Amino acid sequence: MKLKKFFAGVVAAAMMLTMGATAAFATELEPVESKTVAVNNNTVTVQKIYKLDGQGISPEETFNFTVSDAEVTNAGTNVNKNALPVPTIGSAKYEATVEGGATTAGNTKKITIDFNKDGSLIYTGVGIYTYRVAETAGKTLGVAYDTKTYTMKVTVVNGDTVGSYKIHSVSFTDNATKQKDDAPSFTNTYTANTLSVSKTVDGALGDKDYPFEFTVNFAKNTENAEKTWTDAITAEKTDANNSKSTVNITSDSASFTLKHGESIKFSNVPAGLTYTVSETAVNDYETKINGNKTATAAVNGKVTTSADTDKDEEIVTYKNIKGIETPDTGVILDNAPYIALLAIVAFGGVALILNKRRRDEE
């Protein structure tokens, strides 16, 4: 009986020791997060996605990132909390080409965060290290920079040998949503499109072979005054026979002529510009811009329209009308039948009056 009680006591003591050891281990090492990124040779990667909204080719640009605001919890005694190690982060370079720049589907690159320095792990003690990872906003016109900030948590534990350390896990939390993210990414968008200007001549006296003079100017609008612009706009003119030719753009402007049925298209116009289209007025022509009637233009004047660019295609139509205002003769041929009819009626009336008078005299 005493022996049974002794064994029962031993079993109970063993269970208590096991539970205590389990609890102690649990507090000593935090389990791996359900959402972590893969660690390869003490490095992790995040994604950079560059998208195109509209039509155009994004300018060459290198996107940079920062790792900052280092903090640590559960730090070992040999960790200097006033000089915490900070990993390095790479950059993403995009070319000014169709395939090497922003694309509609999104051009994706890998950004490496490196926890090594001179071939060794930067950490010299255990702890849970946290950082803020963000993109450095640039100033390229037409580019929307990602303002997202991630909190990166790096859990460092004892290594396989005394005095060595290793990364147990790396996880990211989106600071905006407070959600864990196992595929952190930064997305930028380049927005650009086209501007088209066309010419139509109408009216009985409209000269369809006359070359109307135009000037188009581009300038950064007030909201984007601090942005930089690479001036990569191109222009192509199409005549009435669908033949195409290049139009030079200098100093943010282009001068050209358009006849009836001709047009010009400016490509790769970034969002954030203000364009101004001006036509040199020709005497006696009424001008309509995008179907809206304007006053008859005076000689040497300008007929102008302007707007800001965005992701949508801009289309400007100029229609010049010159009709007959005052007849050159006293007779309008279109009224001749009615005049002849009135003459016949008048002649008949006179004949009746004369015939009646003759009868009365008899």
Feature names for model-found ranges:
Residues 2-362:
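Solvent-exposed loop/turn and edge beta-strand elements of beta-rich ligand-binding domains
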